[in-house]
Amino acid sequence: MSRIGKKPVVVPKGVTVTIDGSTVTVKGPKGTLTRTFDPRIKISLIEDQIIVERTSEEKEVRALHGTTRALIQNMVTGVSEGFSVTLKIRGVGYRAELKGKDLQMSLGFSHPVVIQSIEGIQFQVPSADTVVVSGIDKQLVTQVAANIRRYRIPDAYKGKGIWYEGEQRPLKPGKAVGKGK
């Protein structure tokens, strides 16, 4: 039995869950999320808890058991609290700003990088070197943050680039000049 899959998902007050076969719809104060899961996983709603069970002991179904439960938990958390990822921009002349709903960044290219706003994603720029990506769908929020980060992955020597908040990477030492002579 999956250690994650056997735990029930508690549905908080203000969140409604509708299960139609293998399709789960979660509505909350922040929005609505719908997702269709593998039919070999049985999903049921008992009082204020979502129970996830598998119908067979095949290896693939066992793997899907915990994954399905985690995805449902993320849906419930997303519509009740939401998700956000904070990115820090490090580098001389690197900065971000909002242009309407779109995010515009100067990252050392000959042109500004513009990221179009996507439905379900909000950008915030509390300071010129900080970008907050938020929304209710965890997968979408983290994917958009990863796509933004891909424009300038942190440099191993100087640390210039786009970092996740709290990310720690050791910087490599530069060339040792004059040694070994």
UniProtKB/Swiss-Prot annotation:
Cellular component terms (Gene Ontology): cytosolic large ribosomal subunit
InterPro entries membership: Ribosomal_uL6-like (IPR000702), Ribosomal_uL6-like_a/b-dom_sf (IPR036789), Ribosomal_uL6_a/b-dom (IPR020040), Ribosomal_uL6_bac-type (IPR019906), Ribosomal_uL6_CS (IPR002358)
Record GO terms (molecular function): rRNA binding; structural constituent of ribosome
Gene3D superfamilies: Ribosomal protein L6, alpha-beta domain (3.90.930.12)
Name of this protein: Large ribosomal subunit protein uL6
Similarity comment text for this entry: Belongs to the universal ribosomal protein uL6 family.
PANTHER family in alphabetical order: 60S/50S RIBOSOMAL PROTEIN L6/L9, LARGE RIBOSOMAL SUBUNIT PROTEIN UL6M
Organism domain of life: Bacteria
Record's subunit section: Part of the 50S ribosomal subunit.
Keywords: Ribonucleoprotein, Ribosomal protein, RNA-binding, rRNA-binding
Gene it is expressed from: rplF
Function: This protein binds to the 23S rRNA, and is important in its secondary structure. It is located near the subunit interface in the base of the L7/L12 stalk, and near the tRNA binding site of the peptidyltransferase center.
A GO biological process held by the record: cytoplasmic translation
